[in-house]
Regions:
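Sec-dependent signal peptide recognition
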Residues: 2-10
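N-terminal low-hydrophobic presequence detector
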Residues: 9-12, 186
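Hydrophobic h-region of N-terminal signal peptides that target proteins for export
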Residues: 11-19
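Non-catalytic structural scaffold of enzyme domains
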Residues: 20-418
Length: 418
């Protein structure tokens, strides 16, 4: 049975400098050795020596959380499509674009790799995600390459953004790369509306350990920042069978531990929540409710956390700001689609490959905890997981319900996947 690290209300780990040379060099060399894109984690080099404008946009996450980012992109309408000027025109800014989504569900949650000393392996996983999007090959046939990559995962952005940019540069590809962390920080800066209180960054343990949000936020605000890292919430939202605790109870326990620590440290009152995991917008109401629960909680005739939580909490969802960053990058590079796509979006997820020698499988067919977190990097082409189409039927029931109710544009696109 898999076990997960307990929630961490604040992570104070210092992440060592990433060994960019070895991990990135291995992925770069692997792809360069296979310019025909005929093996795992490779792409057809010739695909990127032509006009890329009508290629799809690639979006990836460790699971289904990135669908919240895809939804924000598909709904984004901040500009007139005819003139390109600021101002909504009733037509989504990306109406003419097609998307390829990939969720690395077999290897999630990404947030726990750093805590068990597997940061370099996580970085390799992230580069493999990128190579899948860039390439054509998948287990059942072929898919189109992509002209842009959106890292719709905070942990993957924190640990992989610079690696991806370095690899894309080494391959000589004119591919746009956008991450969610800087976009989230910019979103907070542009929507502060006079808020002066503390910012609570809600994320995975791995994202907290990277310190990516405090660093990014320090560039745009002097407001105090405190992190709440959860090791199980993203997995619970995914419907991971090893996480039996109800989502509401996980959130309530995480927030309670976070506020207990904040009270002990005499931290600044919190008035803004940064949804620093792409899964969390799916349960944003439950998160706000948990803060309200503890704000009003009485113990020994007093409310110990009332002064720590504002009566109204502002939420910052980096997804919408990621959409705007993507639009600006595509527009600035003259890479917006020329011909509106009539083809549907494509969705893929990873699943364990039982045919891979030595793969460790649990009774439910997932990777065992020991195998998943025991792997080492420098095997970019390994296929202990394979990528297959994501269909509504492949989503756990509770997850499918969240997507159907809260991400209608994405759910509609998913209906066409078979």
């Amino acid at each position: 049975m898999r076990t997960y690290l307990r929630h961490a209300w604040c992570v104070v780990l210092t992440v060592a400098a990433f060994a960019q040379d070895e991990v990135v060099a291995s992925a770069v060399a692997h792809a360069q050795a296979h310019p025909e894109g005929d093996v795992s984690a490779s792409f057809v080099a010739a695909d990127y020596r032509r006009d890329l404008r009508d290629l799809p946009i690639g979006v990836f996450d460790s699971g289904v959380g990135g669908l919240t980012v895809l939804e924000a992109i598909k709904a984004h309408d901040r500009h007139d499509n005819r003139t390109g000027k600021e101002g909504a025109d009733g037509v989504p800014d990306f109406a003419g674009e097609r998307f390829v989504y990939f969720g690395d569900q077999a290897n999630m949650p990404y947030g726990n790799y750093s805590a068990v000393g597997r940061t370099d392996f996580l970085r390799e996983l992230i580069l493999r995600d990128v190579l899948f999007l860039l390439g054509r090959r998948y287990v059942h046939g072929q898919k189109p390459p992509v002209k842009a990559i959106v890292i719709a995962c905070n942990t993957a952005t924190a640990y992989g953004l610079e690696d991806i940019r370095a690899a894309v540069k080494a391959w000589g590809l004119p591919v746009i790369v956008v991450g969610v962390v800087e976009a989230g920080a910019q979103g907070l800066a542009e929507t502060a509306d006079g808020a002066q209180g503390g910012v609570a960054v809600l994320a995975t343990v791995g994202t907290c350990a990277s310190n990516a949000y405090p660093k990014a936020l320090a560039k745009v605000t002097a407001r105090p920042v405190r992190q709440l890292g959860s090791a199980t919430l993203a997995a619970a939202i995914e419907g991971d069978p090893s996480v039996q605790t109800p989502i509401r109870d996980i959130i309530r326990a995480d927030v309670g531990a976070f506020l207990k620590s904040a009270a002990a440290d005499k931290a600044a009152p919190i008035d803004t929540l940064m949804l620093g995991c792409t899964h969390y917008p799916l349960v944003a109401d439950e998160i706000v409710a948990a803060f309200a629960y503890w704000r009003d909680h009485e113990s020994d005739g007093r409310k110990p956390y009332a002064a720590l939580v504002a009566s109204e909490l502002k939420q910052v969802n980096p997804a919408a700001w990621t959409a705007e960053a993507l639009r600006r990058s595509l527009q600035g590079s003259k890479m917006m689609a020329v011909k509106p796509s009539s083809a549907g979006d494509l969705f893929y997820i990873s699943v364990p490959n039982p045919a891979w020698p030595g793969v460790g499988l649990a009774a439910d067919g997932s990777l065992t905890y020991e195998y998943k977190y025991g792997r080492q990097p420098n095997q970019v082409g390994r296929e202990d997981t394979i990528n297959v189409p994501m269909t509504p039927e492949k989503l756990p029931g509770a997850t499918a319900k969240l997507v159907r109710e809260k991400l209608p544009l994405t759910w509609r696109s998913l209906q066409g996947v078979r």
